[in-house]
Amino acid sequence: MSRLLFVFALSICLLPVSAKASAVESLKAFVNKALTFRADFSQTLLDKNFQVVKKASGSMMFERPGKFRWVYDQPYQQLIVGDGKQVWFYDQDLAQVTVHRLDQTLGSTPAALLAGGNTIERDFNLQEIDVQGETEWLEAIPKNQENAFELIRLGFSQTGMLREMILRDSFDQVTWLIFSGTEQNPVLTPDLFQFTPPEGVDVISD
């Protein structure tokens, strides 16, 4: 395991609870003020022993409530689009589109979680975590036991910009997202949150 991943794994287990309220305030401000958002991301999936399973990268954007576009560029091309009612998963290599209702996916993807409305305090138990470097950490534990993730951690800069996101699922796999080139409240055109399946692909729906 690399030194970076070792430090990351240690932080997952040992980050102490802090008395500060800055991360919660940053989250509330982000939810209430970031009506649109855009960023590039790198994503690392780790198994329960914190060994790297896969890495990916791409770009993402959202418009509250419930509209988002999540694009994987590497190592494969995949597109996830939420149009406010449905979520479209397009795997270009498989030539396959899967469609789900938005309310069925709100807790199952990072994109849907970030693009949700201002109900986070209703849906999650929030707990402060100590500052690491220049990043203020917050832990959110879903109140709904059927959520795809058991634990979510959000890292904000001291100016309140989202920097990192960590999600642990029921198999103790960890998804680690690092955001860069972030823009809060950019102008996003409606067509970015619309999707029409390409001709000839298989479409699987609920």
UniProtKB/Swiss-Prot annotation:
Pfam families for this protein: LolA
Keywords: Chaperone, Periplasm, Protein transport, Signal, Transport
Main location: periplasm
Keyword Signal found: yes
Gene Ontology cellular component terms for the protein in this record: periplasmic space
InterPro entries to which the protein is assigned, alphabetical: LolA/LolB/LppX, OM_lipoprot_carrier_LolA-like, OM_lipoprot_carrier_LolA_Pbac
Record-level GO BP terms: lipoprotein localization to outer membrane; lipoprotein transport
Signal sequence coordinates: 1-23
Family: Belongs to the LolA family.
Known partners and oligomeric status: Monomer.
Name of the protein described by the UniProt record: Outer-membrane lipoprotein carrier protein
UniProt source species: Nitrosomonas eutropha (strain DSM 101675 / C91 / Nm57)
Gene name of this polypeptide: lolA
